[in-house]
Amino acid sequence: MADSYVPLPQSAGYAVVVGLGFVFAFGMMLTTYILRRYNKEVMTAEEFATAGRSVKTGLIAACIVSSWTWSATLNGSTSQVYNNGVCGSIFYAMGATVQITLFACLAIKARERAPAAHTYLEIVKGRYGTTTHFVYIFWGIVTNILVTSMLLSGGSATVNDLTGMNIVAAILLLPLGVVIYTLFGGIKATFLTDYAHTVVLIVIIFIFAFTTWATSSKLGSPQAVWEIVTKLAESNPREGNAGGSYFTMHSRSGGMFFVINIIGNFGTVFLDNGYFNKAFAANPSSTYKGYIFGSLAWCAIPALCSLTMGFAALALEHTEYWPLGRPMTAAEVASGLVLPNAASALLGKAGAVLALLMVFMAVTSAMSAELIAVSTIATYDIYRTYINPNASGKKLIWVSHLSTVIFAYTMAGFAIGLYYAKVSMGYLYEMMGVIIGGAVLSSALTILSKRQNWHAATFSPIISTALAIMAWLVCTKKKFGSVTYLKTFEDDAMLTGNCVALLTPFIIVPILTFIFKPQNFDWKLLDQRITRVDEEEELAEALGGTVSSDPERLHPIKSQISVIASQLVEGEREQYQKEKEILNKSFKICCIVCCTLAICLVVLFPMPLYGTKYIFSKKFFTGWVVVFIIWLFYSAFQVIIFPIWESRTDLYHTFRGIYWDLTGQTYKLKAWQNEHPEEMHAVRSQLQAQLSRTAVTHEIVDGKAFGDGYVTPANIDDALEEKKG
């Protein structure tokens, strides 16, 4: 498209990237004002990072769908179908669903064992001390760098392809609106814009699906697509596929990608602080449900999108409708340009606009989650831990804002460098498992197992990553003769590096744990070592007052919100204890459900079709398409309708308050808020904070926590220094 046909003018690119970005930014500013006025949401440091720790299941699921839908999700999965046929959609979708499903187990334990945490790295610090903390900060930041690089690389390439907009300009402008609304609304802004983006995304996929499979005069049915692509395979069979067909799950290249996809995405989920941010922001009872429902809802998005657009590209590439007028090059496919070309071929300029909107939504929603992930690491794991442990909430908010801006435009510069170096989105996607996969097991065991010791947690990621990079490069040299960009991108080399990265820790962790003896960590210590930020100053200022000290009583005067919360604590204590018990009991159920789903997604569903080398008949392919269209309807219910239903009471209160203001009945709003303080978000947030604090004070004695007879020192760094001495 870039060298022969650009369906949209450059102005369309700027209108979407800049104009739509500012629309979302303005909308978030307005939403922040509405939430503050009608729900009493105060943007404290805690609120910025955790949204009051009360987000419900439906919205968590919607956020999971949005955050996990990258430009690589849409463009990369479509390229897989274009390259390998029908297996590409399943191997991409199910190979990247299993990680979110299994992460639910990790989320529920992190929420239970560190209820005051803002990042998973705080758990690492609380358990293993400074050295290990820095190791995982490195891997966490590298994960965010790789993900954000893919977002900007894939998104800018698509914008350029559809509009001719300069790629460097696109890279610099894509983060602008995201930064603005993230600064104003924090993680709550991310959640709400995630919801809006997901609605638009699903609607656009439905439009493409019904056009391709039902209404288009160019295609119009699964049967027509099957016939066209079957003829294509007769003249140009797909090497490595059973019978050379595009309608088989048995594909050598597809199978390799399946393994690479599974391994690489374990790192981008288990090491991305953004997914832990959502776990810590969730209502305790919603934590694992949001991840399970969200993973199932997400699976249909890349599956149906890639199935639709990949086969549309295969069917239309050799017709007069194809905008390029020639087949795509391997570089264009690797850059993720199959989807925008297919959209233009299918619906002309309307299709190009829809593809542009879809990719813009995917890039900006996922990037906002990455910005929050990095800002919380910078704020709580670096600034609050090592620079200013007594920082006020206002200072932490300032650090969060600064780190958001710095990371966004550092990554823009890095993405520009990748563009000039001609490193594609597809290359980054397959390489990320080699770089970050070595830290997956040890980071998970830090939360799940009290036996993993300091040596295993600290050295396993370093050793595994070094071996993975070595294996990747050695395989490239031995199998392909030289180490170049294109040679390291070969399936065999990428597969080798990814497998070594993920699987080596399964050997190293047990060996180091056996040699240096297992730890017996007392989880109760995390309650002492990881604390919430004191919000009194911010809350008092939000109400128009200040916080001062009462020298006679020797404790700070509380804000009005905290006073009200204190009055409600006793009445809520029993329910709080029940929620903690439910969280504990839910873990076993969660593990059974998640493991069952994972086996179904990775083994039971795709493997029989792979092993039998079955080639889809026309009827079977039609049924296959129908199943995924129905699945997307479930996704629409789960992430569009269900969040509204769950929040119906809050929405009613908000719109009623707006009505009272617009009709000159503001006195009713103030009277209702005074009579029902328990309904106010800020009060509920403080209530949870006070319940959390009072629940653990009796478990800490002289700086030590007592559990099952084993006592872990309160300061792990001091203990390690003593041991070394």
From Swiss-Prot:
Positions of transmembrane segments: 15-35, 57-77, 88-108, 134-154, 167-187, 195-215, 256-276, 296-316, 343-363, 396-416, 428-448, 454-474, 496-516, 589-609, 624-644
GO CC annotation terms, alphabetical: plasma membrane
Sites where a glycan is attached: N390, N584
Phenotype when the gene is knocked out: Decreases significantly spermidine uptake. Reduces significantly salivary gland-secreted histatin 5 (Hst 5) mediated killing.
Its membrane topology: Multi-pass membrane protein
Annotated localization: Membrane
Keywords from the named record: Glycoprotein, Membrane, Transmembrane, Transmembrane helix, Transport
GO terms under biological process: putrescine transport; spermidine transport; urea transport
Gene3D superfamilies, A to Z: Sodium/glucose cotransporter
GO molecular function terms listed in the Swiss-Prot or TrEMBL record: putrescine transmembrane transporter activity; spermidine transmembrane transporter activity; urea transmembrane transporter activity
InterPro entries: DUR, Na/Glc_symporter_sf, Na/solute_symporter
Keyword Glycoprotein assigned: yes
Short name of any one Pfam family annotated for the protein: SSF
Main subcellular location of this protein, as a coarse class: membrane
Function field: Major spermidine uptake transporter that is also used by salivary gland-secreted histatin 5 (Hst 5) to enter into candidal cells. A major component of host nonimmune defense systems is salivary histatins, a family of small (3-4 kDa), histidine-rich, cationic proteins secreted by major salivary glands in humans and higher primates. Hst 5 is the most potent of the 12 histatin family members and has fungicidal activity against blastoconidial and filamentous forms of Candida albicans. Hst 5 cojugates to spermidine to be uptaken by DUR3.
PANTHER family: PTHR46154, UREA ACTIVE TRANSPORTER (PTHR46154:SF4)
Family: Belongs to the sodium:solute symporter (SSF) (TC 2.A.21) family.
Protein name from the UniProt record: Spermidine transporter DUR3
Organism: Candida albicans (strain SC5314 / ATCC MYA-2876)
